Every structure is written in C-alpha cells, then in structure tokens.
Amino acid sequence: MGFATILYSIWVVLSSFVILSAYQLEVRKFLVKLLSKIVIGASESNVASFFAFVSEKSLEAASVKFVATIIAERMGAQFSSFYDKIFFVDMLGLGSLFALAAVNVLAARKLESELPASLEPSIGNRDQQKNSSLAKCFSRLFINDLHGTTVKRYPYISYLPNWLLAKNNAERLVYKSHLLLNAYSPPKSASASSVIVWVCGAKKSESIIIPYLSSLGFFVVVPNYAQPPKFPLSDAVEFVSLCVDWIVENAIYYDADPERIFFLGEDTGASVALESLKHIRPNSVKGIFALCPRSIQNLVWTNQSTIPMMTLHAGDVNPVSDSNDRESSEKASLIKNFVVPGAVPYYYEFTSPRTISTATFIARWFFLVEDNKKTI
C-alpha cells in the first residue's frame, strides 16, 4: 500500500508538471533540461517533442492519466491516508486536459460556422488525415536517420506558441491543416547552426535540397502551412510567421542560432516568404532566397527590408532586357510583378530547380551572406 502510494504520488507530480508545461514556457524549459539529463539517451529535442505531443493531444493524454489512476487504485493506493489529497490534485490535472479537449472542439465548431465558404478545404484529404493519427504523432518522438549519421529528421513538431494551443487544434479540425513542421538537424559542431526556413511551393513535396543543405551545416525547418490558392495569403503568412516564433523559442534544443534565420522560398512559397517579412519582428530574418518565384494575384509588394535577397529564375537570358520571344516576355512580366527592394535576380539555366547543383548555388549564397563577403 505504501509503495503504491509513493508511485502514485510521483506520477501525479510528474504529470502535473507536464500539464503545466503546456501553459508555462519556463516550466517546460526547466523540465526539458532536467529530463534530458535524467533519461538515458534522451536529447533535449526529444523531450521537447514529447511535451509538444502532450500539449496537442490533450484527449489522449487525459486517457493515459485516467488509466494510470485506475492502476494506482488496483495496487491499493486508495487505502492510504494521503490518497484523498493526491487524488484531488490528480483530478485537477485530468480536468484541465478534458477542458482543453472540450475547448478545442467547441472552438472548432464556432470557427467552422463563421468560416466563409471560400476558405473551406476539400474534404477527404486522406494524407492529412493519416498525419493526425495517434501513431503518426508518436513517430515525432524519435529521430529518423535519413543519411547515415549526417542528417537527423524530427517530424511533426508543433510550431504554434503554447498560448495558441486551443486555437491550433480548433483550426486543425476545420482547416484540415496540421500546423506542424519537419526539422532537419545537421551534425553537431562547435558553434550553433544557422537556420533556413524552407517555404515550399504548391506541390508541397520536400526536395533533396533540404537534407543537402542540412548536411552542409544548416538547421532546416519545413513548415506545413496553409498554401495559396487553396487558402488565403494572409493565413499562409500567419503560419510562417508563427514558425519563426517557434524557431526563436526552441532553437536552443537543436543547437541552432535563432539570431541567424534565413528564408528559402520555392514557387508560391517564395511569395509567401517575402510577404511574411512584413509581419514578423524586423531584422529577425537575415536573408531570403527566392527560388523560381511565382506571382500571386493581387499581391502588392510593400516590403522595404534591406536584408540580402536573391531571386533565382530559370533561363540564361535576362527577360527584362531581351523580351523578343514569348517566353522571355512572360518572364519579364513576372519580374515586373515581383519587384522587391534589395532583390537581385539571377538567371540560371536548369531543367529542374530541385537538383544538387541548384542546392550548391543556394548554399554558396547563404555562406556568402553569413560571412559578409559579398553585398547582395
């Protein structure tokens, strides 16, 4: 009976701290550092991913807590004189988890009723439904080795701040967008890694460029955001901006430097990345590379940032000065709609932007920006 009470008490204390960490950033930081030292083989990033899982999956966490309470009673903990007090604290935590789950559902219902028809996504995206499964979410607790011992991938990590957890889950139910990110961590080095935020294009597939850049020493973050034209540009910009907030808050867990964040946008993602610069803290992004950018209708550039920018287009001819043929004329029109102060367009003839040669060009540009060897 005494042993069962001790175990139950330890469980209640630990689970209460975990629940509290979903709302208090300082508590989570303390637990991440503590558990990474106590649990053998667990890194700070693994522990941080675990807390993200508990925060997002409140109903599953509540179920585990409920089962643990039943096990404690079966072991005889209820016969202890301290059981009532411990049980009361346990029920406070259980109630908090159920309340968070209820808020998520109610908020989603309210959000869905207010949502304009134009924002409603197509129903039945089975790939996204699979990503929301419990087993899929558990997979982010472990490191997936992509390329031997060079690049480590941390999948399905939440990038929304803790104070938006309820809104996160509510919008996930309505928008069918998971608001998660994949992170690629390079081999450990003496200094913290620079961060590249890869804002993907319409096809939403991850390029070979991503692990390649990571193998060169960059910490690459790929947000799963609401992409235009299926979603409004404002939603995409909001999600990418929140991703930057996540990096600033969590970079320490991945040996990355939150003061050295770069944007790499492809296709429509380049437009989203550029537009995001107007909505994030000034100078939080140190440079931006636009890969084959695609113009978004009715998007008016008002960005006045002086950060280094590079635009990479397909073709070896400057379409602005040589617009005799139809193809060059179309490119010239694109450039006209894609004028960004500080951007330097570069025309590189290639069959596909997703190649190692293109990645080498991109990496070289980022290294030049970091070393201040070239004014862009």
From Swiss-Prot:
TM segment ranges: 1-21, 34-54, 86-106
Single annotated GO MF: hydrolase activity
Key words, A-Z: Endoplasmic reticulum, Hydrolase, Meiosis, Membrane, Transmembrane, Transmembrane helix
Protein's membrane topology: Multi-pass membrane protein
A Gene Ontology cellular-component term: endoplasmic reticulum
Subcellular location: Endoplasmic reticulum membrane
Name of the protein in question: Uncharacterized protein C8F11.08c
Organism the protein comes from: Schizosaccharomyces pombe (strain 972 / ATCC 24843)
